[in-house]
Structure formats: C-alpha cells, structure tokens
From Swiss-Prot:
Annotated protein name in UniProt: Periplasmic nitrate reductase
Gene name linked to the record: napA
Keyword presence, Ligase: no
Family as reported in the entry's similarity comment: Belongs to the prokaryotic molybdopterin-containing oxidoreductase family. NasA/NapA/NarB subfamily.
Keyword Cytoplasm: no
Top-level taxonomy: Bacteria, Pseudomonadati, Pseudomonadota, Gammaproteobacteria, Pasteurellales
Length: 830
C-alpha cells in the first residue's frame, strides 16, 4: 500500500496521540489510525509567532489530543518548530482559570480583598459601574483604557475597536504590538503611505543574499529559517549575513557574521547609503521615477517622562515626527560623514565586513532581502532605522520584486492582522485609517452608522503612557486582554505595578491562566484559548488565515469576543454619548451599545452556520447570529477598493490563507509592482500608491546616541529577548512539560572574560542590578548565546525572574515603541 506525504504526516501525529494515550497501533494500519482512533483533523494557524504556520489539529472526545504540521500549507510545508509540535498541550495546564474572580472583602469588591468567584453578570456590573463613574466625574473617555494584543483574533480586534472608539468614545486602546511592531508600522506608513511588507516568503527561494538585522530567526522564526537554510545550502552563490550585538544560533549559517555595538546600526546603514552614492551605484532610473527625498527632525528625545533630564534637553521633542522636503544633494550631505572609518569607529565592526555588506546592497546583479525583528524595532530610534533600511533598498531599486525587498518580521500571530490591519492602536482605525484624519473618521462613522462626531480625534494613551497615566491617576480603568504586561512591559517596579495597585483604579485581566498580570489585577476573567473559539489571524506576509472552533473552553471560560460583545449590553447610549450626538440619531435613544454596534443590520445579518456539521460556534449559539462573519464582512468594507482588499469570509475557511490585496479572487505576492499588484497600472512598472504622487520617501536622519549607556557603576550593556523553547512571558509554553523541561529557568549569558573580572564562574548565582531594579539569575558563559565583552543577555519568559524590573521605559519618540535592547547594568555574585 502506498503512503503519500500527507498520510505520512498524519500517521506521525496519530502515533504521537497513541503514545500519549498509552496504546499501540499496528504498523499496517498506521496511515489510517486517525480514523480508527476517532480523531478528527482540521486546519488552524499556529498560536505562536508571526510566521503563520498552519497546523492540523486532532480532536477526540472534546479535547485536542494532537497537532501536526500541515503538509498542504505553503508557509511551513508540513513542518513545525518545537513549540508548534506541542500545541495540543497549551490549553490543558492544571491551573486554568475557569470562573470570574473578583477581589472581595465583606461580600463586596475591595482593592485589597481576596480573589473570590463571581458570576459574569457581577463581574461586568463592577466594570460597567466603574466606567460610568469615570465618565460622569472626568468627562474624558480617554480615562478608560484597554490594552490588548497581537494574539487576539481579527474578529476580536474589530469588536474591541468598535466598542472602545465608537461605543465608549475612548481612543485609549493599544496593543502589546506597540512594544514590538510600532516602529515598523510607522516607518512603513511614513515611507510608502501604507503599512506592511511589499514582499512575501516566496522571496526566500528567489534571492541571492539574506541580511538579518537584529533577528535570531533560527530560534524566533525557525520555520522560515529552515527555508533560508535550504536556500543557502542549495547554492554556493547565496550568501547570509547575520548582524547582532551578540552571537546566537543564526550565526551558525552566516557567511559574514557581524557583531556591532548596541545602537550603532544607525551608523552602519548610513554608511551603506553613503557607499552606494560614492561608488555610483544609485539606480537613478528607479530613484527619479519612484522616490522623493525628505529630511527628518533631529534631537527628538527618548520618550521618557517629560521631566526627565534627557527630555528637558531635547530641542525637538514636540516635533519628533516631522519630515521636511529635501532633495538628493541634502541627503548626500547627511550620510557623507558616515565613511568606512567612521562606521567602524562607532560600530566596532571590522572594516572588511562593513565593506562586504555595503557591496552586497550596492551590487545591481545581486538580489537581496533584509529581514529584521526586535533588534531594529525595540530601539529609541526604531522608526529611523526602519527608514534607513528602506533607504538602501530604494536607492538601489531592490524592492517590490521577487527576491528583493525589506521585510519586517512580526513576533505575534496576528500583530499584522489584528493590531495593524484592524487598527487597535490609539491613533488608528481599520485599513490604515487614523482618528486624526477627518475624512477617515467620516468613513468609519458612515460604515458604523454613527452620529457625526462620535469618534474622537484625540489619540489616547499608548502602552508605556498607559502605565504612567495609571500611576498618575489620569487613567482609572484598564482592561487587559490576551497579554501579560506585568511581566512583559518595561520598568515594572517604577511604572507598571504602582499604577495597577493605585486605589483609584480598576484593573481587569482576561486570561486563561494566573499570569503575573492576572494575580496583580482586581478582576480576572477566564478566557478561551486558540481553537476553543473560531478565529482569524494575519501573518507577516499579509496572509489572512481562518480556523473553526474545535472544542469548548473549560468551566465558565468565554472568548474575548464574547466578553467584548456581551459587555456592550451593560451601557445605554444616554450613559456614554452626549445629547448632541443623540439629537442627530434619536432612534438610538434607550438602546444599548450592543444594539447600536452589533445589531446594526450588518454585523447580525448572517445566520448561524449550518453547512459545517460537527462543529460548534459558542458565540453564534449565544447571540443567535454568525457574529464572526458579520464582523469580518463589515470590517473588510473598510479596505476593499483601495489596496487592502480581503476575500469574502467563506473563502478563507476553504484555503490555507490568502495574501492581501485579494482582487477577483487572486492574492498579491509583490505589492507596488506591475504584473503582480492589481493596483499598479500597465506601464507604471512600480507605483507606491499609498501616496497621491505614487512615490516612496527616502529619509535623511543621523546617528544619535542611546538613552542610557554603561558607565563606571553600571558597566555592562543589558539586552533582553527570547529563547527557542518559550514564547514571550511563558504563560503557555511553561505549562507544556516538554518545553519546561527543555529550558526550565531563565539565565544570564556573559562573556567568560567579564565573568572572570567579577570573580564569577559558569553556573554561579548572580544578581543583575540597574537603576530601576534587580533580579536573581544564574550565569551561563558556555551556552547557545555568546556575548561579546561588555554585554549580557537575558530573557523574560520566566515569571520567577522578572527581567523587566531592570529595563528602561525609554521609547522611540515617534512610534512610542519600547527599547528593551539597551540599558546599563551591573552584575554581582548573589
């Protein structure tokens, strides 16, 4: 009997499931074991990173019993990383929260009370009463906040935006993508007039060179790394450059391994631009037709509190994002100081390596893709450094074509689809629209059938400012969903924890587990995970993927979508809207926000799905209509017709995702390029149609120093990040026994010479100390991460070692994104 690849992959998963159940399967029956065992298989995107791998989910008796790589998925082609192979276990930790828990004392809510089980109605009543009291007292909707995630589904993100920005009229809603992707998003919008990459993963098989900037793809995007490895090892002409402030596993494949001093990537990129100009490698035909030059503001500060000395000294803090009209000659002058010698002096990179790198970008015969993640984005000049990599691709014309382009990789499964495309940032609306643009607001109010003026044009508090506003009493209600900011946010000691425990504030956390955030909150709402609900994600290559609900959540767990929509029933329009607004649409008087936002004739127009026997949809059962479909089709109307086109809802359930814009059923692989993008007209060749003149911006900005550097007392650089086995704060992965055993606790990686100078040895218990806090860990001088002298590396997955007690809450002044990669630290024996 023949066994094809798909059956082989399914058989592997069946064997794994059988082993977990303690049974054996006859070899002759292994290919059909899933049917014999009663396991049902269905597709879903992986719950972890932004790669967007598809997995097949095996369910039996109401539980997920196995997962496997999806052989029909173009992204991962049947492969999973180590985290993906154990997806079936993330929902079954022994400590799942299964009922709402409210801090209570003497039978009522008390900030210092003990967590006590309550009903959903009690929980929502406490929340609604607090919000109504704030609105009545402060008359400022931005005093009520939501902090969410690039892990919530597209449907959930859209429902949140409607409730917060339209219903409660607050723009204080921000995702944790502010911590990881804001600089990339801002630079995309500023450069091209539209967000998200122009290329796709197909570039990997078509390029001649890969340059990784601050990205350990071997551990953080391992399936993409497997494709890069295959491409590199299949051709001697293909080269890999890996750039980082320390050596990690991606260096094993590097032809040119480059270690640079923290923050000096700015100088290196300006050197490359200068090299291209000085060696007459500018693609003038491309530059003249498709680009324009601007000059950025300088001396813009570091996103710290206004009274901080660095902010007081910054001359242009209030105009940080301004760009001035310029020309090539001025740009040439801006990059001219960044000679080979100067770039070497600032970065510490050997001159021959810098020159090799510059020649690769300059060579018109060599296709090249730049990949980057947090090393670029978590940067007090993250917007600038994103601009700079676009600069070198635009100067050479290596962009928007197969095998050539700048590619920002996302770290969360729907940082693109939910946070960016839906617009769950304080300043955004769906499809790249913003609250500060009256035309965009008018479009949103028309689609949502709202009175004119409902949506505020004042952005709310973004992520780091939310923490400060809670501490200062300017923000008095925060609902956190699907993230763990008490562990993942910066400067926990000084900024986050004080605001959460401020007696005037109510903090609500929706979480499936008692995370650091949950136990610090006032109210915990039990949340369904992954395939316990129907969902959709959007990955790093603009691919939108759907999945069906496979199993039910435990106890009283409810999806974030159910929580948001059900909560809207607790407000009547008179309680949250002004008389002026109600006078425009008197038919809304006496109605709940649920009726106005979700029973509006659009969201509720699709009936409960009946063509998928055997599947459940808890939201459809509770609300009486196909909520996910209604939300998606209304959301999609924002983008159709102007470059953000999505396919119809039902199509996504039939395919392994489509890359937008999707026009006439066809996805787009390379945006802005004639022959691939339906929005580029015949004869245009390239059209950056995000701007009316269809030209991208080349921005001239300099190198500027970091916010904090080592000194005599705090004499080392601290860089924080992740490891392969765990994801973010470990809320899921630390509850998977195999992953926990593989890497049980955080470590501090240090160069052996630095350890010897401090009288330390491998394995020693050490204390890391910064100006903000301290942490106990164990020293590693021999492991996978090899730090240069003067720098240490640690991770933030371990709730027993809160690395973000150490980090500085400096941000990029333009994007508001946190710099987790650079602050000063000292290390002593504990």
């Amino acid at each position: 009997m023949e066994l094809n690849r798909r059956d082989f992959m399914k058989a592997n998963a069946a064997v794994a499931a059988a082993a977990a159940a303690g049974i054996t399967i006859p070899v002759k029956n292994v290919h059909a074991a899933d049917d014999d065992m009663g396991i049902r298989w269905d597709k879903a995107p992986c719950r972890y990173c932004g790669t967007g791998c598809s997995v097949l989910v095996g369910t039996k008796d109401g539980r997920v019993v196995a997962t496997q790589g999806d052989p029909d998925a173009e992204v991962n082609r049947g492969l999973n990383c180590i985290k993906g192979y154990f997806l079936s276990k993330i929902m079954y930790g022994a400590d799942r929260v299964q009922t709402p828990l409210l801090r209570m004392k003497d039978g009522k809510f008390h900030k210092e009370g003990d967590f006590t089980p309550v009903s959903w109605d009690q929980a929502f009543t406490v929340m609604a009463d607090k919000i109504k009291a704030i609105l009545k007292e402060k008359k400022d909707p931005n005093a009520i906040g939501m902090f969410s995630s690039g892990q919530t589904t597209i449907f959930e993100g859209y429902a949140k935006v409607k409730l917060w920005k339209a219903g409660l009229r607050s723009n204080t809603i921000d995702p944790n993508a502010r911590h990881c992707m804001a600089s990339a998003a801002v630079a995309f919008l500023r450069t091209f007039g539209m967000d998200e990459p122009m290329g796709c993963y197909n570039d990997i098989e078509k390029t001649d060179a890969f340059v990784l900037w601050g990205s350990n793809m071997a551990e953080m995007h391992p399936i993409l790394w497997s494709r890069i490895s295959d491409r590199r090892l299949s051709s001697d002409k293909v080269k890999v450059v890996v750039m980082s402030t320390f050596e990690h596993r991606s260096f094993e494949l590097a032809d040119t391994p480059i270690i640079f001093k923290p923050h000096s990537d700015l100088a290196i990129l300006n050197y490359i631009a200068n090299y291209i100009i000085q060696n007459d490698k500018v693609n003038w035909d491309f530059v003249n037709k498709h680009t324009k030059f601007k000059r950025g503001e300088t001396d813009i500060g570091y996103g710290l509190r206004p009274e901080h000395p660095l902010e007081v000294a910054a001359k242009n803090r209030k105009t940080a994002g301004k760009m001035y009209d310029s020309d090539f000659e001025e740009f040439k002058k801006i990059v001219a100081p960044y000679t080979l010698e100067e770039a070497h002096r600032i970065s510490g990179v050997p001159k021959d390596q810098l020159e090799t790198l510059a020649k690769m970008y300059a060579d018109p015969q060599q296709n090249l893709v730049s990949f980057w993640t947090m090393g670029f984005n978590q940067h007090t000049r993250g917007v600038w450094v994103n601009h700079m990599v676009y600069n070198v691709h635009l100067l050479t014309g290596k962009i928007s074509k197969p095998g050539c382009g700048p590619f920002s990789l996302t770290g969360q499964p729907s940082a693109c689809g939910t946070a960016r495309e839906v617009g769950t940032f304080v300043h955004r609306l769906p499809a790249d629209m913003v609250v500060t643009n009256p035309k965009h607001v008018e479009i949103a109010e028309n689609i949502w059938k709202l009175p004119k003026g409902t949506i505020s044009n004042k952005p709310g508090f973004p992520a780091v400012q939310q923490s400060r506003a809670l501490k200062d009493g300017k923000l008095n209600f925060l609902w956190q969903l699907c993230t763990n900011n008490m562990q993942g946010g910066p400067n926990i000691n000084e900024e986050i924890f004080p605001g959460w425990r401020n007696p005037d504030n109510l903090i609500v956390v929706s979480d499936p587990y008692p995370s650091a955030s949950a136990v610090a909150a006032d109210l915990i709402l039990p949340t369904c995970m992954w395939v316990e609900k129907e969902g959709a994600y959007g990955n790093a290559e603009r691919r939108t993927q759907f999945w069906r609900q496979q199993v039910k959540g435990p106890g009283q767990s409810r999806s974030d979508l159910w929580q948001i929509v059900e909560f809207s029933k607790y407000f009547k329009t008179e309680e949250v809207w002004s008389e002026e607004l109600l006078a425009q649409m008197p038919e809304y008087r006496g109605k709940t926000l649920y009726e106005v936002l979700y029973l509006n004739g659009e969201v509720n127009k699709f009936q409960t799905p009946t063509n998928v026997p055997g599947y459940i949809n808890d939201e459809a059962e509770d609300f009486g209509f196909y909520l996910q479909k209604g939300l998606f089709e209304e959301y999609a109307s924002f983008g159709r017709g102007h470059g953000h086109d999505l396919a119809d809802f039902d199509t996504y359930h039939q395919v392994r995702g489509l890359r937008w814009p999707v026009v006439d059923g066809k996805e787009t692989l390379w945006r802005y390029r004639e022959g691939y993008d339906p929005y580029v007209k015949a004869g245009e060749e390239v059209s950056f149609y995000g701007y009316p003149d269809k030209k991208a911006i080349i921005l001239g900005v300099p190198y500027e120093a970091p916010a904090e550097s080592p000194d005599e007392e705090y004499d080392l650089w601290l860089c924080t990040g992740r490891v392969l086995e765990h994801w973010h704060t470990g809320t899921m992965t630390r509850r998977v026994p195999e992953l926990h055993k593989a890497f049980p606790n955080n470590l501090c990686w240090m160069h052996p010479t630095d350890a010897k100078k401090r009288g330390l040895r491998h394995g020693d218990k050490v204390k890391l100390i910064t100006r903000r806090g301290e942490m106990i860990s164990h020293l590693d001088t021999r492991g996978r991460n090899k730090c240069p002298e003067g720098l240490i590396y640690t991770t933030f997955f371990d709730a027993g070692q809160l690395a973000n007690k150490l980090t500085l809450d400096a941000t990029d002044p333009i994007s508001g994104e946190t710099d987790y990669k650079k602050c000063a630290v000292k290390v002593v024996k504990a």
